[in-house]
UniProtKB/Swiss-Prot annotation:
It comes from Mycobacterium tuberculosis (strain ATCC 25618 / H37Rv). The gene is icd-2. Catalyzes the oxidative decarboxylation of isocitrate to 2-oxoglutarate and carbon dioxide with the concomitant reduction of NADP(+). Cannot use NAD(+). It comes from the Bacteria. This is Isocitrate dehydrogenase [NADP] 2. NADP(+) binds at residues 87, 89, 587-589, 592, 603, 605, 652.
Amino acid sequence: MSAEQPTIIYTLTDEAPLLATYAFLPIVRAFAEPAGIKIEASDISVAARILAEFPDYLTEEQRVPDNLAELGRLTQLPDTNIIKLPNISASVPQLVAAIKELQDKGYAVPDYPADPKTDQEKAIKERYARCLGSAVNPVLRQGNSDRRAPKAVKEYARKHPHSMGEWSMASRTHVAHMRHGDFYAGEKSMTLDRARNVRMELLAKSGKTIVLKPEVPLDDGDVIDSMFMSKKALCDFYEEQMQDAFETGVMFSLHVKATMMKVSHPIVFGHAVRIFYKDAFAKHQELFDDLGVNVNNGLSDLYSKIESLPASQRDEIIEDLHRCHEHRPELAMVDSARGISNFHSPSDVIVDASMPAMIRAGGKMYGADGKLKDTKAVNPESTFSRIYQEIINFCKTNGQFDPTTMGTVPNVGLMAQQAEEYGSHDKTFEIPEDGVANIVDVATGEVLLTENVEAGDIWRMCIVKDAPIRDWVKLAVTRARISGMPVLFWLDPYRPHENELIKKVKTYLKDHDTEGLDIQIMSQVRSMRYTCERLVRGLDTIAATGNILRDYLTDLFPILELGTSAKMLSVVPLMAGGGMYETGAGGSAPKHVKQLVEENHLRWDSLGEFLALGAGFEDIGIKTGNERAKLLGKTLDAAIGKLLDNDKSPSRKTGELDNRGSQFYLAMYWAQELAAQTDDQQLAEHFASLADVLTKNEDVIVRELTEVQGEPVDIGGYYAPDSDMTTAVMRPSKTFNAALEAVQG
C-alpha cells in the first residue's frame, strides 16, 4: 500500500456477513473509486483458512494464499486500514462440516482426526487446530479496543426502543459459580523484572518430569499468571447445582465460551454433560470409549457416533439418556421445536451472548415447552461471572433498564498482542497425572510460579505485555478527554493478576495530563454496581477492562442499550499506527443464512459495516490528507443517520425490506448527500446522476429486491458458497446494478 493509492482491506468472512458483503462490496467500490481509494477483498473464511493450511493436499489451481498471515503482517505497517467482519470461531463439529463441504467440492483436504493414533494424524490435527476457535482475532488484534455506540444509533434506540422483558423482585433467576477450586482461587501472578525464556512442566508424583511447553519467550515488564481449575471441584460443583435446580424446580443452563477458550471450555462443558447423564455414561462407558465419543463436543457428538449401532442398541442408549432427565432439572433449550438443548453443542450457548439475552428477557430462557422461564445460569468460573449476578440483583431491585432514557457504556479494552486469557490456548493443558505444575526459567532452573495439581485439572499460563498496558491506559485517558465521560478501570485488587495491573495503571496514569478527568479503579462487582446506578439515571461511563470483560461487556451493554451488539462502532487503533474497524460484536448469525436459503430473505443488518467503513474513510482522510476520503466518511455518516430516521433497516419478515433493500437505501442517501455537499463540486457532479437515478427508480428497485423473496435459493454451499450463485442471489435488482456500473464507467 502506498500513499498515492490508499487502500481499505475488506475481509470476506462467513455466514450472514459474507452474504451481505456480496451485495455491499460493489456499492463500496463505486463510491470509493472517485476518491482514489482502492477496496481490496481478503478471504479469511473458515473454508479459506482450511485450504491455506493444506496446500500440499491441493492441486496448483486449488491453492489459495494464507490471507490471515498476510493481514497479520500488514497490522505491523502504519498505513494499514482493515474492515473486519464477524467470522466463525469454529467448534470441532463446524470444522468437520466445513471439511466435508470442501471435500465434496473436490478439495482433497484430509479428514479431521478426532482421536489421532499415528504421527501423521497428530500432525494433521495440529494443523487443523489453527483453524479452530477464535483463530482470526488474535492475529489481527494488534491494538487495544475502543468500542462505543455511535450517536445516531443511540438516538435511534431512544426514539425506537426495542422490546425488553420485565424483571420481577420474585424472579428466581440467579448465577451459580464455583466458590473454590476454580481459576480465580488457584491464580498466581508476577511482573517480570527482566526478559526470560520459561517452560511449563509437570513434576509428576510418579517421579517423572513432563514438559508441557518447552519454551515461552517473555520480556521485561510482562505480567504472567499461572492458574488451574480442579476437575474434582468442578464436578462436585455441577452435581450440587444440578441437584439444587432439580429440588427447587428451576431450569438449568450452562454458559461458557467454548469458541474463544477452545482448549479449556470444551473440557468444562464436557464434564457438565457427563455429570448430567452420569447413569447412562456409567452403563455405556466402555462402548462410548470404543466409539470414540467425546462429549466435549456436545451431545451431538454422542448421537452421531451411535448412528452406526444396531437400532436396538441405539434405542437402549437413547432411552437411558432420557431416563436421566427423571431426576435432573429441566434444561434450557437452544431450539425447543427441534429438541436441541443447551448440551447439544459447546458453541450453541456462548456466555457473552447468552447472558445478555437472558437479562434482556427479564432473566428468562426458553424451556423444552417453548416457554420463557427463570433459570439457574451456571458460569463455573467465578472470575467474571459475579458481574452478571450483580446486574441481575440490580434489575430485581430496580426493574428492567429503559432504552429510551438509559445512558451508555463505551468500552476501552486491553486486547493487544493476545492479552490475558484470550492468548492462553497454546499454554493450556489438561493435567495427565497428579503432581506439581511449574513455570520454570529455562536458563537458571528457577521456579517462578507453582501449583499443586491433580489428574484432569486444567492448568494454563496467561501473559500480558507491558506495551499494550501502556497503550490501554493512554487510550482510556484519550477517550475520557474526548468524550468528557468518567473512566472506570474494572480491576479487582484481590485477584493476583489484576493487582499487578493496578500497579501499572497507577504508574502509567502519571504519564498523562488527567486534570479535570474522573478516573477510578474498582473491582468488577463494584464497577458493575456503580455503572448500573449511573446507567439507570441516563449517565454515561467508560469501562476500561481486561480482554475477557471487553468481550462480555461489549455484548451486555449494547444488547440492553441498542437491542444488539452488531450496531457498535468498534475501532482497534493498531499499535504500529494503522487502524482496524470491526463491524459489531454479534457473531455471524447462522439462522439468518437458514432464512435466506429457505425464503430468500436476509435479515442481517449491515449497520456495523456502514459505521466501520465511515471510520475507515475518516482515518484515511486524516492520515493522508485525502479530503475526498473525509467527505466520503462525513456523507456516509449523514446517510446512516437518514437510514435510521427513515427506518430502513432490515425486517425479520420475508416479503419486507431485507439486507439488500437496506443497502440500496444507504447507497441512495449517500449519493444524495454527496450530490448536495458544496465542499467538492466535481464530486457532487459525479454523484448527482447516481442520486437522480436511484431516487427516481426507488420503487422499481425496492420491488426488484422484494419480489424475489419467498422461494428457496441455492448459493452452492454453506462454508464455501459459490461466488457466481451467491452474487446472483444477493444482487437481484438489474436497475440498481446498472446504476452502480454506470457511475463507475
